[in-house]
Regions:
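Inter-lobe coupling linker of SF2 helicases/translocases
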Residues: 213-214, 220, 224-245, 256, ...
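Charged, non-catalytic accessory extensions
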Residues: 1-11, 16, 31, 36, ...
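Walker A/P-loop
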Residues: 139-159
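SF2 helicase/translocase NTPase motor core
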Residues: 58-72, 77-98, 103-134, 152-155, ...
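Conserved segment of the helicase C-terminal RecA-like domain
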Residues: 548-580
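A short beta-strand element within the Helicase C-terminal
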Residues: 244, 291-294, 520-533, 558-561
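Hydrophobic positions on the alpha1 helix immediately C-terminal to the Walker A/P-loop
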Residues: 155, 159, 291, 435
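Conserved RecA-like helicase motor core of SF1/SF2 enzymes
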Residues: 514-554, 566
């Protein structure tokens, strides 16, 4: 039986694409290709595939049905060949690889690969993944608004890995702030084997130089990570608008919500170009409803009505939000996230020299306000409370400005007087600095000690002043004290963060500005944080504290604030106000997981202005900074109308929505705990491995032995890869040229630093993978890339080995094996795909001949039965790693007729599945149409620019929804199992 391509009419426009789906083989340009991904275009399909015929083997290519003549091989037209390999290795490889190459349905409830990664998947994190992939939503578009430290990056990694397994993650774009780009890239690669190529402006330019002028640089790499600062440039907008992504991640999305800003334009440009959109921010609400509505519109244009009001029920489904003390989080984090201690506020009695400066500021500047700028006296106060260096810098800058103007002699004289007083506040006469030294020595920061601390200050001048004097007074040695601030180059910032994470470096004290307060992890080796000066903002305090108070922190975080207490404290009023600010942030962290609602400004600058009004006695602290308990009461009243709200309640609607989302997330976690995952296992973290292989390295080993004729261990010159399996969960191999080519799509810093093109080391167990990851961060390298990379289910090396192993197998052939069956049995896979070529449903069937029934033309008939768990079924029939293969058996002469009958029976069964899937899709369409009607009916009739833009997005989503309905079914025979008695 020979398999010939489906006949088509001449010309690409007349092609039969009814069987085009992932996993089929096609012929294009006189070569054969295995289809990996199919996506709809305006005039046909885009087909991403990998070469299987000799000339193009292992090469990747993209074809368009509008341009190329595509011939599809009928997957049901196969020949059967008895498998004579040891333990039916060839068949197990073929089946495992085919199952992995075929995407699982997008809406499959079971998590396929997320629990098999190098992560510690807690139930609340897996619940977030399930929620993102739920069939309640048309496509995965969510806002991950978990509080600082809950592991949003891990959740993103799990969502992306599941999307990849579902055939929805071929092209991925991740956009982050530049200072967390390397950290994000490392997490996704080391833990999930999701490779992102890091691009900056120079990187994009290098790609452009490799391509024709008309080629889009963002099409060169399938998965990339770029900083928001780089990508927001208008010069990239045209290329971004033309690019299409399967998934886009935008981290710290609150930086892109101000309408008209370049960041916002970037987010608006990217949102329509992707099917899956993951937005992340611990502080998504900046106090302006319009900004939060921008986030909602990016995710779902129907979530904000025409009149500008929010559809609360729709919006709630878009948001996933929890915090450290949410019940579903607190119950599982345990020692993986030690409870934060109450803050320690250290009041420091000012020295005579400090008191002299404070008195001058209070009497001359604050009370008399002789400056031409009303707020400048408080700028001086804030600088004074930071350090003598910060105050001197402020004075110098002011003098430069005034010297260029007339009529400021009095102010200049007073500035000079303050400068003279300030010059006497050396480190020996700065009691706050002395208190810092005493505190650091008290907690054990000294020469030869492993203890570390991170010190925050708002002023760069203070950072350098502290470094200079701590070096002098602590004598910790070279490289023990370092400074980081936003003025440093990106590479230097990333290197400092990386150095502070690792155990083997001499760095003991990191003195940093607020550039490190957002998104940077500093908890690996540190649980002591010092506020040398205190921001006049709850948000900034919370962001700083979150650097060490986060998941993975095994020691109770200790937050300490140094509070200078001058004799004239009442005049500049700082001590009691900032003490209460620190305490309120702690209370909010415990109850809400977020301090921003206490002031309702959601913006550090706006909060600072309000705190200044408290200091100037214009407002009372309780008026400006609400208690967390009052906030919860007000929010509940907004969400639950049955609960009476206080008349003066000013809790904003957005926080009420976030609280409702938090409660919905808790309900989802509870449901996940009660429901099974489809395999009979309750809970979420203990997921069964769905594979014919007990471990990933066994799959790799079989693939290598099959590919290299059982000589994988041989030297490369002898046709092997020098494969070695150590007894400590480590394997090694020397990558051949075809594998090295795939390394072009890995993080290049990892490839070059670990020299993986020369020798590749893989960790085959989670404990060993964690050990190497920890060693890279703590002791044995200059960079945080692990020496042995974890071998997870999406690892490109395993994919390469399987491709290489099956390369010589004819595309029209399936194996036959011996098993525990009574009659010849055909295992088949049926898939339903939509018009975009995506798998909507996947079923497995076994079929046997109906010996008592023949077709009208005398042909065989068969009966098919559904298989709930194909891996368990294959093990039950005996296809296991120790299966006995006598190696000498034949297939029945009428096996071709049996396969034809099995395919017919399977098609009948699949038709019922198709009907049910179409009904589900129609329900989804009807529900969406009703939402669209409500949107159109709700609000004014004026068609503003925003409304017109929203209408365009709604129409785009309408077309997408229709294209996602099941349209085509495909049945593929996979293997024939013959009774052992035939041997």
């Amino acid at each position: 039986m020979t398999n010939t391509p489906t006949a088509v009419d001449d010309g690409p426009q007349n092609q039969d694409t009814s069987q085009l789906a992932p996993g089929v083989t096609i012929e294009c340009r006189d070569e054969q290709w295995l289809v990996n991904n199919v996506s709809k275009t305006a005039d046909g399909f885009r087909i991403r595939c990998r070469g299987v015929s000799d000339y193009v083997r292992d090469q990747t290519a993209t074809f368009f049905t509008a341009l190329d003549k595509i011939q599809v091989f009928d997957p049901a037209d196969v020949t059967v060949k008895p498998d004579d390999s040891p333990h039916f290795r060839h068949s197990r490889l073929w089946l495992e690889s085919t199952l992995r190459r075929t995407p699982v349905p997008l809406y499959q409830e079971n998590l396929e690969v997320a629990t098999q990664m190098l992560a510690d998947p807690l139930d609340y994190q897996l619940s977030a993944v399930r929620t993102a992939l739920s069939d309640d939503r048309i496509r995965p578009r969510v806002l991950l608004a978990d509080a600082v430290g809950l592991g949003k990056t891990l959740e993103i990694g799990m969502i992306l890995s599941e999307l990849i397994r579902r055939g929805r993650g071929e092209r991925i774009l991740v956009v982050t702030p530049k200072h967390v780009m390397e950290q994000f890239q490392q997490e996704l690669w080391t833990r999930f084997a999701v490779p992102l190529v890091r691009l900056d402006s120079q990187g994009i330019q290098k790609v452009r130089q490799k391509l024709p002028a008309s080629k889009n640089p963002f099409s060169y790499f399938p998965r990339v990570i770029v900083s928001m600062d780089t990508l927001k440039s208008p010069k990239y907008r045209a290329q971004l608008q033309k690019s299409r992504w399967d998934a886009v991640v935008i981290d710290e999305i609150h930086n892109a919500t101000n309408a008209g800003s370049q960041n916002n334009e970037l987010a608006r440009t990217l949102a329509p170009t992707t099917e899956s959109l993951i937005l992340a921010s611990a502080t998504p609400h900046n106090g302006r409803e319009d900004s939060f509505k921008e986030i909602l519109r990016l995710l779902d244009p129907l979530s904000v009505r025409k009149d500008g009001s929010i559809d609360m029920q729709a919006a709630k489904k878009l948001i996933i939000r929890r915090h450290r003390n949410s019940p579903e989080v607190a119950s599982v984090v345990g020692q993986k996230w030690a409870q934060r201690k109450e803050p320690r506020n250290i009041p420091v009695e000012a020295s005579p020299e400090e008191n002299a400066v404070a008195r001058e500021l209070a009497d001359t500047w604050v009370q008399n306000n002789l400056s031409s700028e009303r707020l400048f006296p408080w700028t001086l106060v804030k600088a004074f409370l930071s350090s003598p260096a910060a105050l001197q810098e402020t004075i110098d800058n002011r003098r430069k400005n005034l010297e260029q103007q007339d009529n400021h002699h009095t102010e200049l004289d007073n500035l000079n007087h303050v400068a003279d007083l300030n010059a006497k506040v050396t480190e020996e006469h700065s009691n706050k600095f002395i208190a810092l030294v005493n505190y650091l020595q008290e907690i054990g920061v000294k020469k030869g000690s492993e203890r570390r601390a991170v010190i925050f200050s708002e002023r760069v001048a203070t950072l350098h002043w502290l470094k200079e004097n701590l070096d002098k007074h602590l004598n910790l040695g070279k490289g023990a004290v370092k400074v980081m601030h936003g003025g440093l180059p990106d590479t230097e910032q990333l290197a400092l963060i990386d150095e502070f994470k690792r155990e083997d470096t001499p760095l003991r004290i990191l003195i940093t500005g607020d550039v490190a307060s957002e998104g940077v992890n500093l908890h690996s080796q540190c649980h002591h944080l010092v506020h040398y000066d205190i921001p006049w903002s709850l948000i900034r305090i919370q962001q700083r504290n979150g650097r060490i108070d986060r998941y993975g922190q095994e020691h109770s975080p200790e937050i300490t604030a140094l509070l200078l207490d001058p004799q004239d404290a009442d005049s500049i009023g700082e001590l009691h106000v900032l003490t209460r600010l620190i305490e309120r942030e702690y209370s909010a962290n415990q109850l809400l997981g977020d301090a921003a609602p206490l002031m309702g400004k959601h913006n550090p600058k706006a909060e600072e202005d309000e705190i200044r009004r408290i200091l100037t006695r214009e407002r009372d602290f309780e008026e400006v900074v609400a208690s967390p308990e009052d906030i919860v009461t007000g929010a509940h009243a907004k969400v639950q109308p049955s609960e009476p709200a206080a008349q003066d309640d000013d809790t904003d609607d957005i926080f009420a929505l976030l609280l409702a989302a938090e409660e919905a997330s808790a309900e989802a976690s509870t449901r996940d705990e009660l429901e099974t995952d489809g395999t009979g296992v309750t809970g979420t973290a203990d997921s069964i491995r769905r594979s014919l292989y007990a471990a990933e390295n066994k799959y790799l080993e079989d693939a290598l032995n099959e590919a290299f004729n059982d000589q994988a261990f041989a030297k490369t010159q002898a046709g092997g890869v020098e494969y070695v399996e150590h007894d400590n969960d480590i394997v090694e191999l020397t990558p051949p040229k075809d594998l090295q080519r795939r390394f072009d799509y890995l993080p290049q810093d990892y490839v070059s630093y670990r020299k993986v093109a020369e020798r590749l080391m893989l960790a085959t167990s989670v404990p060993k993978g964690e050990q190497h990851l920890r060693a890279a961060r703590e002791g044995d390298s200059q960079k945080s890339w692990p020496r042995a990379h974890f071998l997870g289910p999406l690892h490109p090396v395993t994919e390469w080995a399987a491709d290489r192993a099956l390369a010589s197998m004819p595309q029209s052939e399936i194996p036959a094996v011996l098993g525990d069956v009574t009659e010849p049995t055909v295992l088949l896979m049926g898939t339903l795909t939509n018009s975009r070529g995506q798998v909507v449903s996947r079923v497995f069937l076994s079929a046997q001949e109906l010996t008592f029934l023949r077709g009208e033309d005398g042909t065989k008939t068969a009966q098919s039965s559904s298989i709930a768990d194909v891996h368990a079924w294959l093990r039950e029939v005996g296809l296991q790693d120790r299966a006995i293969n006598p190696g000498d058996f034949d297939t029945p002469e009428d096996i071709t007729a049996l396969i034809a009958a099995a395919v017919t029976a399977a098609e009948d069964t699949l038709e019922m599945t198709k009907t049910a899937a179409q009904e589900k899709a129609n329900q989804r369409i009807d529900a969406w149409k009703q939402r669209r009607k409500d949107w159109e009916d709700h609000g004014n009739t004026q068609r503003s620019l925003l409304v017109r833009d929203t209408e365009r997005l709604i129409q785009q989503e309408s077309e997408l929804l229709v294209s996602m309905t099941p349209q085509r079914s495909l049945v593929r025979p996979l293997v024939v199992i013959l009774p052992r008695k035939r041997a």
